[in-house]
Amino acid sequence: MNRFVIICLLFTYYVIWSLLPIFEIENSNPVVSLLFPISSNVAIFLPIFLLLIGFTLTGSVLGVLLIRSDKKKKV
């Protein structure tokens, strides 16, 4: 249950962080700049970057496994 609460809090923080530019309150309030010190553009590009890294690593591992299994069949 504790893990679920932490995940919900992180998701809520991320959603608020990514919606700040829509309501134009990113730099207007000092409390907001303390809670969200990094620009909201990072909130958009971070998942894209992580997905690219994940797909690259997954593809690399699958490629190595396919090459190794093909070499074993030939021997």
Swiss-Prot record:
Main location: membrane
GO biological process: dolichol phosphate mannose biosynthetic process
Recorded topology in the membrane: Multi-pass membrane protein
Transmembrane segments: 5-25, 42-62
GO MF, one example: enzyme regulator activity
UniProt cross-references to InterPro entries, sorted A to Z: DPM2
Keywords assigned by UniProt, alphabetized: Membrane, Transmembrane, Transmembrane helix
Keyword Calcium found: no
Name listed for the protein in its UniProt record: Uncharacterized protein YIL102C-A
Lineage start: Eukaryota, Fungi, Dikarya, Ascomycota, Saccharomycotina
